[in-house]
């Protein structure tokens, strides 16, 4: 009898440019492949045995001739290359119109409404920036004036950074809730609270980041699961991405190691339902910072942690490992990249095989839906291929 399905999203671990990547400025991007070559090879014995070497050319991870899992890759059908778009498509919501971006900063009507309705003394920044860089550039002025640092990226995001000694965490969250309401008509995917700590020149972001997402514009597979009485545990930023819709339990995490440990612990007590996990460090700490060595270490950390999760799965359980977009740390850009994403599916006792290139991330959601016996409107399930 079907019991549990685990989805691990290695945030940003793309595996090669999509055909339209050049239109996004991402020709040649291959987060996994380019990272492996930048560091002289990766040591990923578990992922390699599962078939990761089949999805793109990864130095140190050759294609295993007898993989233990089913392997393939997925292409994004929606416009965009961001976290929200990728996760929504995985759960059956394909965006025909891309979410709005602000390459020139936010217009006065947005900024003025934010200042007026939050009571903030003004804002600093209002530009496209790397979050780790802008807090070093403006952090001292922020602490002196109390003005939050507002910035965006190539993605549809309104980010608000504040030092926790200057703006209490709950105040920052309240400001972001206000921004979320202001920005709904503008089709901005996420408002992100970016708390940081430290002293001038040594500022560092914390894991108390919080995302305030635009609600999905259509019913997701997650919502259908909950309507059918299927438990859905969101680990990491999953609840934020879906505006807490279709989630029955939330697990906050402090990075990849914590998220992986909590996932293993969940499998000791959860005997039915979906466990949906986002592992954010790949993207937040290494992809956006163009740090291939750190990215490689995080991949190897994931590889070492996987056995504790795989060993807790029994007959009828499934585990799918994928990503939501790319963020190639070897390219000049510090933004996300428009890439295929890997798809590894472990079905205990079933061996492995080739799932090919799926034409939409929604194939994963269709598979989840079929596994639990609910309806899906988008995508083609591969459940029969991994359970035959």
From Swiss-Prot:
<keyword id="KW-0963">Cytoplasm</keyword>
<feature type="binding site">
    <location>
        <position position="325"/>
    </location>
    <ligand>
        <name>Mn(2+) 1</name>
    </ligand>
</feature>
<protein>
    <recommendedName>
        <fullName>Phosphopentomutase</fullName>
        <ecNumber>5.4.2.7</ecNumber>
    </recommendedName>
</protein>
<comment type="similarity">
    <text>Belongs to the phosphopentomutase family.</text>
</comment>
<dbReference type="InterPro" id="IPR024052">
    <property type="entry name" value="Phosphopentomutase_DeoB_cap_sf"/>
</dbReference>
<dbReference type="GO" id="GO:0009117">
    <property type="term" value="P:nucleotide metabolic process"/>
</dbReference>
<keyword id="KW-0479">Metal-binding</keyword>
<dbReference type="InterPro" id="IPR006124">
    <property type="entry name" value="Metalloenzyme"/>
</dbReference>
<dbReference type="Pfam" id="PF01676">
    <property type="entry name" value="Metalloenzyme"/>
</dbReference>
<dbReference type="GO" id="GO:0008973">
    <property type="term" value="F:phosphopentomutase activity"/>
</dbReference>
<comment type="pathway">
    <text>Carbohydrate degradation; 2-deoxy-D-ribose 1-phosphate degradation; D-glyceraldehyde 3-phosphate and acetaldehyde from 2-deoxy-alpha-D-ribose 1-phosphate: step 1/2.</text>
</comment>
<dbReference type="GO" id="GO:0006018">
    <property type="term" value="P:2-deoxyribose 1-phosphate catabolic process"/>
</dbReference>
<keyword id="KW-0413">Isomerase</keyword>
<comment type="function">
    <text>Isomerase that catalyzes the conversion of deoxy-ribose 1-phosphate (dRib-1-P) and ribose 1-phosphate (Rib-1-P) to deoxy-ribose 5-phosphate (dRib-5-P) and ribose 5-phosphate (Rib-5-P), respectively.</text>
</comment>
<feature type="binding site">
    <location>
        <position position="324"/>
    </location>
    <ligand>
        <name>Mn(2+) 1</name>
    </ligand>
</feature>
<dbReference type="InterPro" id="IPR010045">
    <property type="entry name" value="DeoB"/>
</dbReference>
<feature type="binding site">
    <location>
        <position position="283"/>
    </location>
    <ligand>
        <name>Mn(2+) 2</name>
    </ligand>
</feature>
<keyword id="KW-0464">Manganese</keyword>
<dbReference type="InterPro" id="IPR017850">
    <property type="entry name" value="Alkaline_phosphatase_core_sf"/>
</dbReference>
<feature type="binding site">
    <location>
        <position position="288"/>
    </location>
    <ligand>
        <name>Mn(2+) 2</name>
    </ligand>
</feature>
<dbReference type="GO" id="GO:0005829">
    <property type="term" value="C:cytosol"/>
</dbReference>
<feature type="binding site">
    <location>
        <position position="11"/>
    </location>
    <ligand>
        <name>Mn(2+) 1</name>
    </ligand>
</feature>
<dbReference type="GO" id="GO:0000287">
    <property type="term" value="F:magnesium ion binding"/>
</dbReference>
<feature type="binding site">
    <location>
        <position position="336"/>
    </location>
    <ligand>
        <name>Mn(2+) 2</name>
    </ligand>
</feature>
<dbReference type="GO" id="GO:0006015">
    <property type="term" value="P:5-phosphoribose 1-diphosphate biosynthetic process"/>
</dbReference>
<dbReference type="GO" id="GO:0030145">
    <property type="term" value="F:manganese ion binding"/>
</dbReference>
<dbReference type="GO" id="GO:0043094">
    <property type="term" value="P:metabolic compound salvage"/>
</dbReference>
């Amino acid at each position: 009898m079907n019991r549990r399905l685990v989805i691990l999203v290695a945030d940003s671990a793309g595996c090669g440019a999509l055909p339209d990547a050049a239109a996004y400025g991402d020709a040649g991007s291959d987060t996994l492949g380019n990272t492996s070559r930048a560091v002289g090879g990766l040591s990923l014995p578990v992922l390699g045995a599962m078939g990761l070497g089949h999805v793109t050319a990864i130095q140190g991870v050759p294609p295993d001739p007898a993989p233990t899992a089913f392997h393939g890759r997925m292409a994004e059908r929606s416009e965009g290359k961001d976290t929200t778009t990728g996760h929504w498509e995985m759960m059956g919501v394909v965006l025909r119109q891309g979410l709005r971006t602000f390459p020139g900063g936010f217009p006065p009507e947005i900024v003025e409404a934010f200042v007026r309705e939050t009571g903030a003394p003004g804002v600093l920044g209002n530009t496209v920036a790397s979050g780790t860089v802008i807090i070093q550039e403006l952090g001292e002025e922020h602490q002196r004036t109390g003005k939050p640092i507002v910035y965006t990226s190539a993605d549809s995001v309104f980010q608000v950074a504040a030092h926790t000694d200057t703006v209490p965490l709950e105040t920052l969250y309240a400001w972001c809730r206000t921004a979320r309401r202001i920005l709904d008509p503008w089709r901005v995917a996420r408002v992100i609270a970016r708390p940081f700590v430290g002293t001038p020149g040594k500022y560092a972001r914390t894991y108390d980041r919080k995302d305030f997402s635009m609600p999905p514009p259509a019913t997701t597979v997650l919502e259908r699961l909950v309507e059918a009485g299927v438990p859905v545990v969101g680990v990491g930023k999953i609840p934020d991405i879906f505006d807490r819709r279709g989630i029955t339990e939330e697990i906050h995490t402090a990075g990849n190691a914590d998220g992986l440990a909590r996932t293993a612990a969940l499998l000791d007590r959860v005997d039915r339902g979906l466990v949906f996990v986002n592992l954010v460090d790949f993207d937040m700490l290494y992809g956006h910072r163009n740090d291939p060595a750190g990215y490689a270490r995080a991949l190897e950390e994931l590889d070492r942690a996987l056995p504790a999760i795989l060993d807790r799965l029994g007959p009828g359980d499934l585990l799918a490992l994928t990503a939501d977009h790319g963020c190639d740390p070897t390219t000049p850009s510090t933004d996300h990249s428009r890439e295929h994403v890997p798809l590894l599916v472990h079905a205990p006792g079933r061996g492995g095989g080739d799932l090919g290139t799926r034409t939409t991330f929604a194939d994963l959601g269709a598979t989840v839906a079929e596994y639990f016996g609910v309806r899906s409107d988008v995508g083609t399930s591969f459940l029969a291929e991994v359970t035959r």
